[in-house]
């Protein structure tokens, strides 16, 4: 019995040792690194300073594969506002797009480097640049106005439950 008690105490001491050590070391935090003291503010308005990678064009991609990719990309934007707007837009319109409309939608959601730009253009907060002011953008703006007053608090299901 004493051997088991001693073993239990040894194990508990081993488990709680880092916790005890952290309580006993009440030292001040280390000084900041020298490289962080003289940080430089980067001006991102200069396009030559920070080149953004261009989205690869996929000319030989089959239309059905492109639509599947765009449906996924419409749902997984990384910001909830665009996830909701673009996923509901894609669920409503993407299946009926022809090849040219699909290419315009691809350029819209993948050609822009900042998702907030898409959001501001679609909600008419900022004017849409000429190269993105297409039939698809006008359709997206109408979709965002939500004249039908459809609830869009969640993304639509990928597949309807009827099938």
From Swiss-Prot:
Q: Where in the cell is it found?
A: Mitochondrion matrix
Which positions carry the signal peptide feature in this UniProt record? none
Task: Return any one Pfam family short name.
Answer: Sdh5
**Chief place of localization:** mitochondrion
Residue spans making up a coiled coil are none
InterPro entries, sorted:
SDH, SDH_sf, SDHAF2
Q: Give yes or no: UniProt keyword Transit peptide.
A: yes
Q: Where are the bilayer-spanning segments?
A: none
Q: Where is the transit peptide?
A: 1-23
Keywords for this entry? Answer: Chaperone, Mitochondrion, Transit peptide
Q: Which GO terms describe its biological process?
A: copper ion homeostasis; mitochondrial electron transport, succinate to ubiquinone; mitochondrial respiratory chain complex II assembly; protein-FAD linkage; tricarboxylic acid cycle
Tell me a GO cellular component: mitochondrion
Q: What's the superkingdom here?
A: Eukaryota
> Family per UniProt?
Belongs to the SDHAF2 family.
Function, as annotated: Plays an essential role in the assembly of succinate dehydrogenase (SDH), an enzyme complex (also referred to as respiratory complex II) that is a component of both the tricarboxylic acid (TCA) cycle and the mitochondrial electron transport chain, and which couples the oxidation of succinate to fumarate with the reduction of ubiquinone (coenzyme Q) to ubiquinol. Required for flavinylation (covalent attachment of FAD) of the flavoprotein subunit of the SDH catalytic dimer.
Q: How does this chain assemble?
A: Interacts with the flavoprotein subunit within the SDH catalytic dimer.
Record protein name field: Succinate dehydrogenase assembly factor 2-B, mitochondrial
Source species, please? Drosophila ananassae
Show the taxonomic lineage. Answer: Eukaryota, Metazoa, Ecdysozoa, Arthropoda, Hexapoda
